[in-house]
């Protein structure tokens, strides 16, 4: 996984620890993953570990933050005022959904998303608060897009903050469904989310997805 640059000479050392932890958590294992196993895989010392992280929980939260930032940066491009072609809010919303389903359906990223949602990660002290911050950061681009639509009348019924939560929650539900592992179901799931979003935002029927895409 491409790491968020640390800007420090020891950044490669930190990245090896993070990547090794992702590997250890993703592979089948019994019981919790011990720091010693992570260090052995990363080929670093305990001193190196504690130079970057105060504890294993701190490492886990850093991993969550790294995955969140990679996703958020990709989504921010769509909501940026200087986005190529200056697309209208509806085009931006559709592009945001496209990006979410493309990113989360990729084999590599799906692996990292699975790890940050695993039971051991969830047990880390501070995980719940960090996960909420992650949600807000990831959805900030969607909030911005909905606010654009409210301002120009594209989304007359939107309440940007609450609608972003609802739309993102449905995206997450679709992406964690067993159906998403069938490539043919990815566009179906994506269009299902779009239809829900456009109804909630008050978009006229002419802009809704063609009903033919509802076929299961």
Please give the residue ranges for each predicted region:
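N-terminal intrinsically disordered/low-complexity leader segments
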Residues: 1-12, 207-216
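A short, Lys/Arg-enriched amphipathic alpha-helix from helix-turn-helix/homeodomain DNA-binding modules
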Residues: 11-23, 74, 123
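Hydrophobic/aromatic residues within well-ordered alpha-helical segments
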Residues: 13, 56, 63, 67, ...
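Helix-turn-helix
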Residues: 16, 24-58, 62, 66
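Hydrophobic alpha-helical connector segments
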Residues: 62, 76-108, 163-167, 190, ...
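Amphipathic alpha-helical packing segments from all-alpha helical-bundle domains
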Residues: 69-72, 76, 125-152, 161-165
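Short secondary-structure transition hinges
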Residues: 101-140
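Hydrophobic/aromatic-rich alpha-helical bundle segments in the mid-to-C-terminal region
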Residues: 110-115, 128, 132, 150-196, ...
